[in-house]
C-alpha cells in the first residue's frame, strides 16, 4: 500500500487556489500566476446579478422591490400583505446579517445580500414560482437549501401547522406565530445557505488574519490550535501484549471527572464501557454506530466516555484521554485517527497505550508540540515460548485451548470444517467481517470451554480477551490487498502474544505461560525469527486534514468542484511536501466511497466530507444500500430501515438450514444495518425507527451465529473472487442484487 508523504514546502491555506488550465489569469489588468498554490490575490469567480436593478448594485440598504407596474403583475404587487411581510423581513435580515459585521466580512456578506435580492427579483417575475398549489416539506422549511424555491416557500409557508412552526422556531411561549416570523426564518436560512454554499466558495480569503486560513497544512501540529494553547502531559504505557499497560491507564481514567477512552474497535469500547458500568463507574458509550448516554437524575451525562478513536471530540476539554493501541498511528487506512487525536485532544493528560515500536515517533511528535513526555515501560506478566517442533500429526495433534491462525475467511472456515470432521473437537471462529457481537459470542464459548479450539484471522490481534494456551500459525504470509507478503515481526508478535493471556493456571507453578508453534517447520522457523527479532521502530505517522481544514480549502474552489478532486489535489500537493515524520492516509477506500454519492448535487460539500468516512464494506448489496441512503439525504426524506427494498425477509428462522442463503448474505445485511445506525447518529431526522433496526440487527446476529454453529460446507469454497459477493438469491433461486 502506497503512503503519500509530505515535504518541507510551506503551504498556507489562504494560498490554496484552483488551478485553471489557461496560460495567464488577469486580475486588475496585472498578470498573476496560474498556480493556485502561490497566487494569493486571485478571485476565482465573481457572482453576476442579472436581475438586480443597477442602482441597487451599490446601494445596499434597500428593502422594497421595484417593478414596473405596467409590465408586471406579480404577487408582490398584487398582495399587500405579502409585500409588507417581505419588506419587513428583508429589513430585519439586513440588520442582523450586515449591520454589525467585522470589517473583513463586509464585502463577502454584501455579495450574499445582493445574491439574495437578485434571486427574489428573478423569482417574482417567474409565474411558476407563484403557485399556491405547492406544499413545502418540513425539511424544506427547517433548512431551505434550494434558493430557487424561495418565493414558493414564502407564499405557502402557512400550509405548515403552527405546532410545527413552534418547534422549528423553538417558540414554546407564544400561541400565535406570525407570517412575518415565518418569512424571517426562511429568509435567514436562505441567506446563510447562499453565503456558505454559493458565495464563500467563489471568493479568496486574502484578508484573513484570524489564523483560521493561515495554518501551515504541511505541519499537522498547527491544525489543532486549541491543543497548542496548553502544555499537555503525554504519558506512555508501552510494553508487549499481556503486560497490564491498558489496565494502568484505565485506572487513571476512572479517577478523574472528565475523560475519554479511545479504542481501536467498537467492541473494545463496549468492553470498557461494560467494565466501568459493572464497577459502578458512570460512563457513556460513543461509537460510530452506537451512542449511550449515562444520565443522572437531573439529565446530566457522565463525565467519562468510552468510544472509538475516530469519535474523539477533539475540541472538548478533558482531564485524561487514553489512546489505546497507539502504534496504529502508522496504519495506512486508519492511522489518521490516532495521529489527529494525539496532536489535537485538549486534555491535561494524554495516556498512550501500545507497543514500544512507537516510542521514537511519539518523541519526535512531542518535541514538535512542546508537550511534556513521561515513559512507563512494562514487562509481560507471563512467559511466552516458541515450541521447538511443529504440531505433531497436523490437525490431529491439536489440543483443547489451541488457537489456529489463518488469514482469509475461506481458510478459517475450511479449517473449522476439517478440524471438526477429523477430530472430536468443537471449533469457534473469529474473522474480520463477523459482527463484533458474534465475535464476542464465539470468544465466550471458547473461553468457558464449551468449544475446544479457536480458528481465527488476525482479528484476534486486538480487542478480544481470549484464554489461549497455544497459538498455531498456518502460514507466515498475508495478502496485503495487492500481493502475498511475508508478515512483519510486529504482526507476528502481536498475534503470537495472545498465547497465555487470561490464564490463571499453568504448568509453571501458577505463572501464566503461552506457547507458539506451527504446522510446518518452515513457518515455525520464520515465526521464531520474528518473535526473537529486535523491535522494528515506526518511522512515520499517518494523518489526514480535518473536515474543517478540508472545508476551508474547498472555499478556494468554484461551486460544483467534485469532492474527490479536492481530496486528490490535497494528496498530490502533500506528496510533494513536508518531512518524513508524517504520511498521508491512503485515498483509495475514501475515493471509492465518494464515488457512490458524488454525482448527487443536492448533498452539500460538508455532508459529502462526512459521508466519505462512512463504514461501507466492499460488498455489492452494501454499496447499493448506501447509495439509496445517500439519496435519502439528498432528497431530505425521512425513512425507516424497513422502507427500503432490502431482503429482510431472509431474517427468518426457517432460512437458517437453507444453504442457498449464504453466510455472506447475512454479513452483508448486518453491515447494512450497522451502516444505517451510523447514518442515524449523524442524520437523526432522516433515518428513524431505530427500534425496528435494532430488532433486525439482533436477529441477523442470531442467524449468523446459528449458521456458523451448523456449518456443513464452506460458503466461500470455489467462489471466483468478486463473482457474487454480497448478493442474495431471489425466490426462484437466481442471484440478484
Swiss-Prot record:
Keywords: ATP-binding, Helicase, Hydrolase, Mitochondrion, Nucleotide-binding, RNA-binding, Transit peptide. PROSITE patterns: HELICASE_ATP_BIND_1 (PS51192), HELICASE_CTER (PS51194). The keyword Ribosomal protein does not apply. GO terms for molecular function: ATP binding; ATP hydrolysis activity; RNA binding; RNA helicase activity. Disulfide bonds: none annotated. The keyword Mitochondrion applies. Belongs to the helicase family. This is ATP-dependent RNA helicase SUV3, mitochondrial. It comes from Saccharomyces paradoxus (Yeast). The gene is SUV3.
